[in-house]
């Protein structure tokens, strides 16, 4: 993973550099974001880190709803770095506009972030609109670094964001680096 970070940090690119910032380990993702903050043009936010950034700008996501959740703990631990990124790089942060969750019938359902009034279920993927936007940005970038999945890709219902963005990267003509075991597993699975 260090080599992946270094390959982005030490190269010069003429076009846009994009980082897909997702996964379960928000602290790791946010640390990489701050390390690469002056090299990356677009941070495509998803996973737990995406919810924490949305929480920091006032949305009702990124909060614990169960005893085993770690949102609140990770938010407190990363608040200063999140706030720094929001203040220093507001135009580079690309937030999800919709999120997916499991409805009462066990199906994938989506909601716009603006319509979330209280977090009463887990968000398990970025929504279709966000996926389309992220895939377009990634496909038009000169370099893309993927650090974490955008959703719970192990469950096919919530693999949509991760799979479609990875496919857009693969179909594009860009320098790409994948960091992290979960993202590598997603590539192997799909």
Regions found by a protein language model. Give the residues of each.
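Active-site loop-to-helix "anion-binding N-cap" substructures in soluble metabolic enzymes
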Residues: 1-190
